[in-house]
Amino acid sequence: MVQLPALYAYASKENIEVLDYPMEQTGSMSVMLEGGECYIGMDSRVKDGGVKERVHLSHELGHCVTGSFYNIHAAVDCRRRHENKADKWAVRHLVPVADLDDAVAEGCTELWELAERFGVTESFMRKAVCYYVHGNLATELYF
C-alpha cells in the first residue's frame, strides 16, 4: 500500500506538478499539455492529508501515467474508458491484490474494514473489490 508522501514523491520523480486549484465539483483533475507535461490540480477540500487526498492523487496520477485524458467534447463511453484506466492504476497502487488477499485471509471482510485498513474510501474499496473479483469497475452491478 502506497502512502501519501510516496505518491507525491512519485509525482515529483515523473515531473508531474501537483498544484492547489479550486475545483468545487470534482475536487481534482489532471491535464497533459501539448509537450507532454502533466499537471494535477487539487482542491483544498480534498487535501486532508489522508484518505481523500490519497484517493484523488492516485486517481489523477493514473490519468498522467496511463495517458488517459479526454476533453469536454468526448462521448460518455470514451470518458468512462479513460476514468476506468485511471481508477485501475490507482487500485493497483493503493490496494495491491496480494495485500487484499492477506487482509481477507486475516478475517477483514467488511468493506468499511478493508477501506479503513487500506486508507481509502468505501466507494474506492468497492471499485478495488470489483476489479479483483470481477475484472471490471462496474460496482453498480455487484453492490
Model-derived segments and spans:
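Active-site hotspot residues in diverse enzymes, especially metal/ion-binding acidic/histidine motifs
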Residues: 1-143
